[in-house]
């Protein structure tokens, strides 16, 4: 019995892919790449959406996750600029998604606070 328990514990844990990874749109693919820690692909996908410049919630979410991607890759000044942009576009989103905290993290990491 002990052997069976030890053998079961020793098995590798296989996580299910994130639920967004089945999406066929640009945002879903970029978000899947972000969740899988493929930050180069995520950045390219989110940047493409942001550069389209559509005034919709998906673009706002793409700006947010582009900022998060920049933070994950150590580009804190770029992330701070994006977070400030979110503040200018939609203060309610900025507050709800706790962008002020993230901006503070960027400033601390950049040595500005």
Locate predicted features.
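Short solvent-exposed coil/turn linkers within tandem alpha-helical repeat scaffolds
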Residues: 19-20, 50-59, 86-98
């Amino acid at each position: 019995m002990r052997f069976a328990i030890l053998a079961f514990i020793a098995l590798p844990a296989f996580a299910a892919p994130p639920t967004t990874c089945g999406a066929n749109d640009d945002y879903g693919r970029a978000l899947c790449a972000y969740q899988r820690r493929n930050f180069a692909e995520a950045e390219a996908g989110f940047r493409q959406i942001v550069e389209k410049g559509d005034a919709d919630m998906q673009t706002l979410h793409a700006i947010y996750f582009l900022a998060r991607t920049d933070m994950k890759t150590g580009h804190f000044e770029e992330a701070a600029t994006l977070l400030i942009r979110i503040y200018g576009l939609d203060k309610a989103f900025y507050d709800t998604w706790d962008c002020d905290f993230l901006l503070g993290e960027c400033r601390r990491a950049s040595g500005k606070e």
